[in-house]
Every structure is written in structure tokens, then in C-alpha cells.
UniProtKB/Swiss-Prot annotation:
Record region (Substrate): 95-105, 146-155, 176-183, 415-423, 434-441
Gene expressing this chain: Trmt6
Binding sites annotated in the UniProt record for substrate: R349, R377
Stretch list, region Disordered: 81-103, 275-354, 474-497
Cell compartment(s), UniProt: Nucleus
Biased composition (Basic and acidic residues): 328-354, 478-487
Function summary: Substrate-binding subunit of tRNA (adenine-N(1)-)-methyltransferase, which catalyzes the formation of N(1)-methyladenine at position 58 (m1A58) in initiator methionyl-tRNA. Together with the TRMT61A catalytic subunit, part of a mRNA N(1)-methyltransferase complex that mediates methylation of adenosine residues at the N(1) position of a small subset of mRNAs: N(1) methylation takes place in tRNA T-loop-like structures of mRNAs and is only present at low stoichiometries.
Acidic residues bias spans: 289-307
Name of the protein in its database record: tRNA (adenine(58)-N(1))-methyltransferase non-catalytic subunit TRM6
Annotated transmembrane regions: none
Primary localization: nucleus
GO cellular component: nucleus; tRNA (m1A) methyltransferase complex
Highest taxon in the source lineage: Eukaryota
Keyword tRNA processing: yes
Length: 497
């Protein structure tokens, strides 16, 4: 019954286009102020806000469409209702005579459940609740609107499907799982992208432990042009939020990753390709194509386990009806062949990962990055002091931290080190407002803080100018530098004569 209900489309879908929902797309479900990122797959049950449904009927419709969830789990496109003409509502002057004794509603919970079982829509249930309320007409007009809004939120199951973006995903993570993004608020992320001058064609370095949200925001703004080098701790980068963006494969060609524990060897000039081969072979593979390789590896591992379990069960059970001559001989090569294919595929992925690491090392070795973004749970001072050497002069850098004290220490160390200007430690202040006729005011509940930012620009310090290995670089930055002292000296001699 559920399958038949989910397969019946509510209306013929429009022709597919760039702004339409396709099978396999990553989308964001929205209900009131709650968001959830999912992937559109046919006949896959999705649970959202204590309701389950299928996304089959959403395929082909445009992003931003609203759907009603029916009792069978199918989505029905919600048509735009014409707003009724303004009618004079019967309302009271105040609520002083209204007593909340729990007896004002004639409908019981059993009656409401019976209405739901009959398949009555939420709008009709809300209308019956209004008609059976003995105190609704005595409420003020504002109280009536508040009552209707509250009942609609409870009984109307309206789901809006949105296209993923930096703003939507940052709001979703900050509301649902702020710990996974280091409590970075969405306005703070916007400030980071602006202060870091993220744009197409840049060569950026990012070190983040925010589930890939900062990385995805940078990739979205760069639009697939330029290169991003992600430094990661541990076995591999975490890009759960990056996968929710649903970037095409062309965006991943300019994305590189490099282990954080090899940065010091790269700075000292002792880095070599053999150091990458000494890493553990069972490290987490690079998530290409939004995690398809990881899912493929898990599926292959599950198939291998099923084959092994089947072999053990067949050997342990004695069933004459199932014994076929030659089966054990044919099964053993099949097992070996599947294991061999799995090992070869794993080695191929490791070799590709090693090549990408070498390419990232070559890009970092040029030391001409256009910017640096740091947003991690680690102390920012050692990270920033090490990674600034890979950034070209006159380029911005931005460091995020949930707390102010680590950034103050980082600020002091940068002042002592030199090579930076325009240092600024800032905190953004955000406040939401309710904007309604005669009821506009700041909301009572607001965010206590969204983190702190330390930003600045790199310059060529005196120690770098004195370094003979960088004379050619500084000379290229200012070709007339060698002529200025001679001209000034000649001018002084003329004045003395």
C-alpha cells in the first residue's frame, strides 16, 4: 500500500532543467526553521521531523517547491493559494477573561487522530480546531494569528526542497550540530570569505576541522576555477559537509590535500616522495565524487564478507540437497578473484592519493599562495606561524577560533615575528528581528557568540630581504630597488658641492 501511494505522482512533472531536482542530487529539506541535507534517491525512505516520506515525486520539479506529505509517504505539490480578501475578523479587545482550563477545545486527541487516519489535510484539521474552540473568538487579533500559526506548525506537514548553498548549510549545521563546525556562525563564515578575498582563479591554502563546511564555501565561491590545498590532521580529510554541496566532478580537479604532519619537512627541505610511501596503507581514502569511492569500498568489503560468511556456512552445514560436485573448486577461485580485485582497487586509489599529495607538495613548495584560511579546533599560533611561509607577500590570511584568548596570543606572536600588517581581531554581532505589522521587535532569543576572527596581510619582512636565497624573489617584486640608493647618493653629493 505504501509503495503504490509513493509511486502515484501528484501531477505530471515539468521537463528537467538546470534548476530542477534530479535523481542523485543533494538537496536540503526545510520545514519551518528546521533543515536537513539528504540525497535524492528513488524508493528511499526519508525521515524528517518525525515523519517519513519518499522523494520520488519531487524529481523533475524546480528547487524551492513546497510539498504536502500524505499519509502514504508520497509528496504532493502544494499549489499557491490565493490570499483571501481582507475580512473583518471577530476578535476580542483583550484576553483578560480567557481562562486556560483545558476545556476550551471540544475535539479530543482521539478525534484528531481519527481525522488524520481518514487522510484529511492539515489545513482542514486546523480549521476544525478553530471552529471547535470556545475561546478563539474572544482572543485578540494578534492572539488568533499566533494560535493559527502554532496549530499549522503542528498539524500541517509542508516540506520545501531547497538547493544547497553556503548560507543554508551553515545555518543547518549551526542549528543542529554546532560542535561539528566549532560553533562557527553563518555571519562569521561570511566575514571569513570576504576578509580572505576568496574568488575564482585563486590559489588558496585551508586548514579546517569544520566537517568540510569552510572548504565547501570556498569551492562554491571559486566556482571550480583555481586551486585549493587542504591540510588535514590524521589519516584523511573529513568532507561530510562538502559532499552536501553536490559539486560536479570538475570542481574536484583543483582540490588537493596534504597531511599536516609533513608540513615541517616541507619547510625544512627534507620532504621526499618516500615519506608518503611510509604512511599507513589503511588510511582513509580521499573522498572523490562526493564520497563515491568510500561507499564503493564499503560495498566491496560487505560483498567480500558475505562471500566469506557464505563459504563458512556452506562448509559447516551438512545439506545433501545443496551439495553440487565441483562447487568448492569453483568457489575458491571466485573468492581469490574478488579479494585480488579489491586489493588492486585499493592500491590504485592509494597510488592516486600519493600522486595528489606530491602535486600538493609541489604547489606548496612554490610559496606563492594567494591566501590562507585557518579554522580548526587546534591552537592557531603554531599553525599560522608555519603556514604563513607558504603565502606570497601582500596576501590576506584569516584565522577563526571559538575563543578570544588563543587569538590574542597569536596576535602577540605575529607582532614579534613581523612580516604582517593590518592585524585585526574582530567579533561579529548578530541579532534577529521579527518583522510583522505593528509587531516588529528584536527576538528574545539570540546567539551568544559566533567566534572570533584574526585577519591581516603578509609583507616581506627584513629577515626575508636579508636572506640571499630570496634576493631574486624580492628583486622581482621591486625591480627599481637597486637604483634608488645610487640616485639618492648622487643627489646628496650635488647638494654638498
Amino acid at each position: 500500500m505504501e509503495a503504490s501511494a509513493a509511486e502515484q505522482p501528484s501531477s505530471p512533472p515539468p521537463p528537467l532543467g538546470d534548476h530542477c531536482i534530479h535523481d542523485g542530487d543533494f538537496v536540503v529539506l526545510k520545514r519551518e526553521d528546521v533543515f536537513k541535507a539528504v540525497q535524492v534517491q528513488r524508493r528511499k525512505k526519508v525521515t524528517f521531523e518525525k515523519q517519513w516520506f519518499y522523494l520520488d515525486n519531487a524529481i523533475g520539479h524546480s528547487y524551492g517547491s513546497a510539498f504536502d506529505v500524505s499519509s502514504g509517504g508520497s509528496l504532493q505539490l502544494r499549489k499557491k493559494l490565493e490570499e483571501p480578501a481582507s475580512e473583518t475578523k471577530e476578535a476580542g479587545t483583550d484576553n483578560r477573561n480567557i481562562v486556560d482550563d483545558g476545556k476550551s477545545q471540544k475535539l479530543t486527541q482521539d478525534d484528531i487522530k481519527a481525522l488524520k487516519d481518514k487522510g484529511i489535510k492539515g489545513e482542514e484539521i486546523v480549521q476544525q480546531l478553530i471552529e471547535n474552540s470556545t475561546t478563539f473568538r474572544d482572543k485578540t487579533e494578534f492572539a488568533q494569528d499566533k494560535y493559527i500559526k502554532k496549530k499549522k506548525k503542528k498539524y500541517e506537514a509542508i516540506v520545501t526542497i531547497l538547493k544547497p548553498s553556503t548560507r543554508i548549510l551553515s545555518i543547518m549545521y549551526y542549528a543542529r550540530e554546532p560542535g561539528k563546525i566549532n560553533h562557527m556562525r553563518y555571519d562569521t563564515l561570511a566575514q571569513m570569505l570576504t576578509l580572505g578575498n576568496i574568488r575564482a582563479g585563486n590559489k588558496m591554502i585551508v586548514m579546517e576541522t569544520c566537517s568540510g563546511l569552510v572548504l565547501g564555501a570556498m569551492m562554491e565561491r571559486m566556482g571550480g576555477f583555481g586551486s585549493i590545498i587542504q591540510l588535514y590532521p590524521g589519516d584523511g580529510p573529513v568532507r561530510a559537509a562538502t559532499a552536501c554541496f553536490g559539486f560536479p566532478k570538475s570542481f574536484l580537479s583543483g582540490l588537493y590535500e596534504f597531511p599536516l604532519n609533513k608540513v615541517n619537512s616541507l619547510l625544512n627541505g627534507t620532504f621526499s616522495a618516500e615519506m608518503l610511501s611510509s604512511e599507513p596503507k589503511d588510511s582513509t581514502p580521499v573522498e572523490e565524487s562526493n564520497g563515491e569511492l568510500e561507499e564503493k569500498e564499503i560495498a566491496e568489503q560487505a560483498d567480500e564478507d558475505n562471500i566469506v560468511d557464505a563459504a563458512e556456512n556452506n562448509s559447516g552445514e551438512q545439506r545433501p540437497m545443496e551439495i553440487v560436485p565441483g562447487d568448492p573448486e569453483n568457489k575458491e577461485p571466485k573468492e581469490k578473484r574478488s579479494k585480488r580485485d579489491y586489493i588492486q582497487e585499493k592500491q590504485r586509489r592509494q597510488e592516486e592519493q600519493r600522486k595528489r599529495h606530491l602535486e600538493a607538495a609541489a604547489l606548496l613548495g612554490e610559496r606563492n599562495a594567494d591566501g590562507l584560511i585557518v579554522a580548526s579546533r587546534f591552537h592557531p599560533t603554531p599553525l599560522l606561524l608555519s603556514l604563513l611561509d607558504f603565502v606570497a607577500p601582500s596576501r590576506p590570511f584569516v584565522v577563526y577560533c571559538q575563543y578570544k584568548e588563543p587569538l590574542l596570543e597569536c596576535y602577540t606572536k605575529l607582532r614579534e615575528r613581523g612580516g604582517v600588517i593590518n592585524l585585526r581581531l574582530s567579533e561579529t554581532w548578530l541579532r534577529n528581528y521579527q518583522v510583522l505589522p505593528d509587531r516588529s521587535h528584536p527576538k528574545l532569543l539570540m546567539s551568544g557568540g559566533g567566534g572570533y576572527l584574526l585577519s591581516g596581510f603578509t609583507v616581506v619582512s627584513d629577515s626575508l630581504r636579508a636572506d640571499p636565497s630570496l634576493k631574486s624573489c624580492t628583486g622581482a617584486l621591486d625591480p627599481h630597488k637597486a637604483e634608488e640608493p645610487a640616485a639618492k647618493k648622487q643627489k646628496c653629493m650635488e647638494s654638498a658641492s
